[in-house]
């Protein structure tokens, strides 16, 4: 018999200590990784529910197992809320991750060796948009587009590449692009060459849900997202469309199950349902507006302090700092800031002279700091601290500056906890 008094602390103290250490790390470090966020206690409660135990192969009303009546309620709730949130007429909440959602879209609409045209990973795209090390670059003939010296998508270059390679699908979306994508222009190019337009909006889904960033739904044939970045929900994936194409929807349904996945994670779908309900609340829009304000405030400080920001600014939740002119690598900057309890990630910049695991830039994102209550003033102050650390790298006072910055970080983290 399983007793509710069972706990990890008594049974597995080594694992329990790692959990406690991670809890402390999140509370005492400032999180600036653009793809991370803090899930609400409600979301985590759903993920820890007894839906963890339930197998539910199939879809609501069409399951292969019995006892799915409550799983059906949960999944339909998530579907209906996502439809309302994103103004979609098709939603699949079963993908376990964004990459698996993308794989399902490719599987539904492409054959092996078909040509896809996606944004280069080195220029801000994602592994699954055709990178050679990804399944998307191995199974399909992947052609890549990039950004200009100013850090902007060159739509005429995208068009010319599309006319040359005649892709079956154009992939729009990004993991490190700080400007607004012209979804309508991308659809225009796709239509010109007879291609599907597939948009991966994982990074900006929360902004889109709040109306802070343009939605690709009116333009794309199909859209995917994760649920844990700007959306702030559980780790998972989502497929959506507003194409009013039942044949397309049938292909997508069967590509998720049974082609790419077996049983869905019902406890995670329950958490997605909670996340979508939270995103429909009025205060969610205020949060997403603040995410962008905070990013802009940080950009202003970096520029004032003499650091080059790719594309010269941001219109979303993230930005890239190019460290080439300062003679710093992204790897070293990541480590130095990490020593001051500021977590970023190293990131390639356009025409990066360094290797992918070294890089010449850092990516900075504001969803997490905004979640814990940072406004423009705190964000600008934080950017100043980061510049202090970067300025001191390689100098005699580096250790002293890092120690002083860490004290400031610990103080503001105590004042603005993640979970109060």
Curated annotation (Swiss-Prot):
GO terms of molecular function: glycine hydroxymethyltransferase activity; pyridoxal phosphate binding
Presence of the UniProt keyword Protein biosynthesis in the record: no
InterPro entries in UniProt: PyrdxlP-dep_Trfase, PyrdxlP-dep_Trfase_major, PyrdxlP-dep_Trfase_small, Ser_HO-MeTrfase, Ser_HO-MeTrfase-like, Ser_HO-MeTrfase_PLP_BS, SHMT-like_dom
Keyword field contains Coiled coil: no
Keywords (A to Z) from UniProt: Amino-acid biosynthesis, Cytoplasm, One-carbon metabolism, Pyridoxal phosphate, Transferase
Gene Ontology CC entries for this record: cytosol
Cofactors that this protein relies on: pyridoxal 5'-phosphate
EC number assigned by the record: 2.1.2.1
UniProt-listed GO biological process terms: glycine biosynthetic process from serine; tetrahydrofolate interconversion
Catalytic activity: (6R)-5,10-methylene-5,6,7,8-tetrahydrofolate + glycine + H2O = (6S)-5,6,7,8-tetrahydrofolate + L-serine
Site (Plays an important role in substrate specificity): 228
Residue ranges of coiled coil: none
CDD domains per record: SHMT (cd00378)
Chief location of this protein within or outside the cell: cytoplasm
Family (UniProt): Belongs to the SHMT family.
HAMAP family assigned to the protein according to its UniProt record, in alphabetical order: SHMT
Subunit composition and interactions: Homodimer.
UniProt protein name: Serine hydroxymethyltransferase
Source organism per UniProt: Pasteurella multocida (strain Pm70)
Gene: glyA
